Structures are given as structure tokens and as C-alpha cells.
């Protein structure tokens, strides 16, 4: 029998069956084309999930299309190194919902922030402290072939 707590196997020391998707292979967004920010401070208790919003501003001269499942899922990063240390580890519905943003306009996209640890050294939940989050945006209507770009690291406070 395989048990998983959050994103990590139980008992500790076993190999995880599935590796979380972290968006590590995506390039960074061009800040001259797309600006992103949190819609207010992001504060969540360790071991819990926060539903927040990502503000996305289209600085280009063409419509921006972002493929989502109704939200974008962030990963938690160490702000000093950029290393992904956690995020959301549960199941999600996967409908294809395209967010369209006209040139020069902005929109709020729901943002899912989980605190399950992806690092055995941190335990099963990312501990309290000042962390960062970033999200990967799929820039086009086809999740399989559209380019993926990462947001800059944004501040996250995790409380006990």
C-alpha cells in the first residue's frame, strides 16, 4: 500500500509516486509585454490552501489569451534561491477556460496557493515564514502547444 500525505510519501524516505508539476522548464514572462501582481497580500496558514487572485495586465497591441482550468495554480518558492519547495497537491477539475485580455487592459485570474511541501527537509507542509510564489501562464488557447511563461516571484506569508 502506498500512502501520500500532501505531496510526500508516508512513511518518510520512500520515493514519491508522482512528481509535482512546477513549471520549472518555462521561461520568464517579458515584463514589457505582460505585467503580473497579486491582488493584495497573500497570507495563508501552514498546511492550508488560499484562493487568491492574480492581476494580469496586457501591455501588448494584441489580445492576450491565457488557458486555465478556471484558475492558475501557484508554486511556493524559497525567495532567496527561487527553488520550488511546495504548492497545491490535490486534485483539480480540468475544464479549458480561456481568459482573454484586450491590449492595454488588465484582468483578475483566480489563483490557487497550496502549502503542501515538495521537500522532505521541510516536512509535510511548508512551515511558517516569508516565502514567495510564482505561477506559470499558458499563453494561448491550446495547453498542449501554447508557450508557457513564469511570473516573477511574488511575496507569500505563511503563518503557523
Annotated model-derived regions:
Residues 27, 37, 57-59, 94, ...:
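Preference for short coil/turn "hinge" residues that link or interrupt alpha-helices
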Residues 34-43, 57-67, 71:
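Short, charge-rich amphipathic segments
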Residues 61-160:
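Extended, well-structured beta-strand/loop surface patches
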Amino acid at each position: 500500500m502506498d500512502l501520500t500525505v500532501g505531496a510526500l510519501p508516508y512513511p518518510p524516505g520512500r520515493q514519491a509516486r508522482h512528481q509535482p508539476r512546477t513549471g520549472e522548464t518555462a521561461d520568464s514572462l517579458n515584463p514589457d509585454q505582460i505585467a503580473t501582481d497579486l491582488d493584495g497580500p497573500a497570507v495563508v496558514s501552514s498546511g492550508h490552501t488560499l484562493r487568491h487572485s492574480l492581476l494580469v495586465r496586457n501591455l501588448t497591441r494584441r489580445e492576450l489569451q491565457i488557458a486555465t482550468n478556471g484558475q492558475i495554480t501557484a508554486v511556493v518558492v524559497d525567495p532567496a534561491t527561487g527553488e520550488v519547495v511546495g504548492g497545491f497537491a490535490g486534485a483539480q477539475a480540468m475544464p479549458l477556460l480561456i481568459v482573454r485580455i484586450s491590449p492595454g487592459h488588465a484582468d483578475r485570474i483566480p489563483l490557487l496557493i497550496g502549502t503542501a511541501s515538495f521537500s522532505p527537509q521541510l516536512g509535510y507542509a511548508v512551515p511558517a515564514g516569508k516565502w514567495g510564489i510564482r505561477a506559470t501562464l499558458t499563453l494561448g488557447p491550446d495547453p498542449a502547444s501554447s508557450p508557457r511563461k513564469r511570473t516573477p516571484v511574488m511575496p507569500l506569508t505563511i503563518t503557523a
